[in-house]
């Protein structure tokens, strides 16, 4: 059975943890759609277009991965794109409660979608976009946390 997965997120910026999840998902699913959310609830460092551009650049090496802009509810995009799986990452137990609530809401809105949770590789379990931005603001080492292109964009942005 060929299954398409959608992986939504703000990706402000995309991290090595995000990329690890996409890489692993690309080995499981026929195709993975990375959906960059506008997300009016968050104050982002990077613009919508910049986040989309970084995701496209970083993930271009994965042949069965597409990056789209998410301009409506994820479940609506999933239905239109015939994605059967909503992919979510769980770094810690603290993520679990929110993600289960979101999963139940998504399934209520689109009974054809299932949420699948992947935990990150241990070396990425503590990485978040917020922490990465803080490290960049303090001119810390970013090489192990983000792609070179993202590091360059971060350094330019936080000067």
Model-flagged regions — what are they?
Residues 1-159:
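Nucleotidyltransferase catalytic core that binds NTPs
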């Amino acid at each position: 059975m060929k299954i398409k997965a959608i992986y939504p997120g703000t990706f402000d910026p995309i991290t090595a943890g995000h990329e690890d999840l996409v890489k692993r998902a690309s080995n499981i699913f026929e195709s993975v759609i990375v959906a960059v959310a506008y997300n009016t609830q968050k104050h982002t460092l990077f613009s919508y277009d910049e986040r989309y551009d970084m995701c496209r650049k970083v993930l271009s090496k994965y042949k069965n991965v597409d990056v789209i802009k998410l301009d409506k509810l994820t479940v609506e995009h999933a239905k239109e794109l015939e994605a059967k799986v909503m992919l979510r990452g769980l770094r810690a137990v603290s993520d679990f409660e929110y993600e289960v609530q979101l999963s139940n809401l998504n399934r209520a809105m689109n009974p054809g979608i299932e949420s699948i949770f992947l935990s990150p590789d241990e070396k990425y379990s503590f990485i978040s976009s917020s922490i990465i931005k803080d490290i960049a603001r303090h001119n810390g080492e970013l090489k192990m946390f983000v792609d070179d292109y993202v590091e360059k964009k971060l350094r330019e942005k936080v000067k």
